[in-house]
Amino acid sequence: MQVRQSIHSDHARQLDTAGLRREFLIEHIFDADACTMTYSHIDRIIVGGVMPVHQAVTVGEDVGKQLGVSYFLERRELGAINIGGAGVVSVDGERYAIGHEEAIYIGKGARDIRFTSVDPAKPARFYYNSAPAHTTFPTRKITAAEASPQTIGDDATSNRRTINKYIVPDVLPTCQLTMGLTKLAEGNLWNTMPCHTHERRMEVYFYFDMDEETAVFHMMGQPQETRHILVHNEQAVISPSWSIHSGVGTKRYTFIWGMVGENQVFSDMDHVKVSELR
């Protein structure tokens, strides 16, 4: 498990390219028949990927000492979205069939969590976020239809995109975790511009659905001290609450957003005008 410490905005603005990437970019998410984990001190979120190919993959079997618990979800909840082939998630013996672009929420207290693929030639690829939890809510599958797809933006500003809200209060209860998937329309390049911050929550963006020659310039930093990180396929960026989080790609792309913090109000944003950015 990799560990990323919190960082003050005054420190972040002094970093060079290598420093920004070291602190905020998660370059590697998926390994065959393995579970990856990056633990951020910012709101204690854990980010990673599970890609079962030839065998079932369990989550968090060896992190008890690092988290100070006897099992992974003893004091945590978890959300996962499948961006690969059909998969199955077993939670304490109960099986959930999770197809492409379907999701699962697993509540606090689940002990035995196993991920498998239906077809090893087309393995499932589960991207997950986990956050501290104070109580238990039921484990549940979320379909793409339940995510209530909403298309916003337009071609003139190159930001027409469809937002899918999988793990939000309107769909199911969680302690603090929210997750969703945003898909840009063909020929559109910008996400979240005009941009915003939200002092009450942190966020992680996971970029995917990109070919080898496609890249996203992820914008970050305080509105008057912006920086960028160049992101490639299946990489994630940690966004502290003081940072904007926006991006422009060389071609269209898709990304998963996950938030934890004080509240779960999707519209609770501190908007920043483009004219105010520096």
From Swiss-Prot:
Role, per record: Catalyzes the isomerization of 5-dehydro-4-deoxy-D-glucuronate to 3-deoxy-D-glycero-2,5-hexodiulosonate.
EC number: 5.3.1.17
Free-text comment on the cofactor: Binds 1 zinc ion per subunit.
Binding site for Zn(2+): 196, 198, 203, 245
GO annotation, biological process: D-galacturonate catabolic process; D-glucuronate catabolic process; pectin catabolic process
Gene behind this protein: kduI
HAMAP family, per the entry: KduI
Source organism: Dickeya dadantii (strain 3937)
Matching SUPFAM superfamilies: RmlC-like cupins
The keyword Metal-binding appears for this protein: yes
Induction context: Induced by galacturonate and at a higher level by polygalacturonate. Is expressed under the control of KdgR, but is not controlled by PecS. Is repressed by glucose.
Enzyme class: isomerase
Disruption phenotype: Cells lacking this gene are unable to grow on polygalacturonate (PGA) or digalacturonate, but can grow on galacturonate.
Pfam families xref list: KduI (PF04962)
Annotated GO MF terms: 4-deoxy-L-threo-5-hexosulose-uronate ketol-isomerase activity; zinc ion binding
Protein name listed in UniProt: 4-deoxy-L-threo-5-hexosulose-uronate ketol-isomerase
Entry keyword set: Isomerase, Metal-binding, Zinc
Family: Belongs to the KduI family.
Pathway: Glycan metabolism; pectin degradation; 2-dehydro-3-deoxy-D-gluconate from pectin: step 4/5
Cofactor: Zn(2+)
Ribosomal protein is among the record's keywords: no
Catalysis performed (reactions): 5-dehydro-4-deoxy-D-glucuronate = 3-deoxy-D-glycero-2,5-hexodiulosonate
